[in-house]
């Protein structure tokens, strides 16, 4: 094997080591290639504006006003939350936006930098202001904990790992090469991404409950919300739950 090929895994390991940073919110070491929020926030803003330009934004309705009002309450709670932690200026770069979009899917999300969208399809399941606050707190928690940056970093890592795997296996016979690539594919799906997602959901559940409580909403509505979400799926899986794997215990939280 050529020396250049031997160096590839070394560079790979060094990249991981330098990208492991302490998460401000959780205090845990996480993989994050985006040390500065500005590039990530700029990318999020561009994608957010593109999304809104391609979908019907609902304005002037009671639900639209609720999403905006509760979003502001949760954003204010987030600032209070970080003030408790001695970091009152941590969210100064956030430029919060809250929109209700006409889509039947049961979904809501918050991009890095505070760009929030609720779909009309989730409003019936939210059912009341406390239910909206539970969803809002959960999605904002994902953004505050840098889950978007971590997911993107994991994607970069997997792409780089795939390139290394292909390079290392290039001179193997076809059968061995196929085995290596298959093993890599299974490893990234089962051993990396899915547990990572559940970890994020658990963190967002905890932080989201704190945010909605600080904002003056009833945290006991959260498990009722997840029960309604589960019942609505009727054996299927709404888009929200497909991107938010939920353990059974969460429903009794």
Question: PLM features: residue spans?
Answer:
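N-terminal secretory signal peptides that target proteins for export/translocation
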Residues: 1-2
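A Zn2+-metalloprotease active-site environment signal
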Residues: 5-8, 20-253
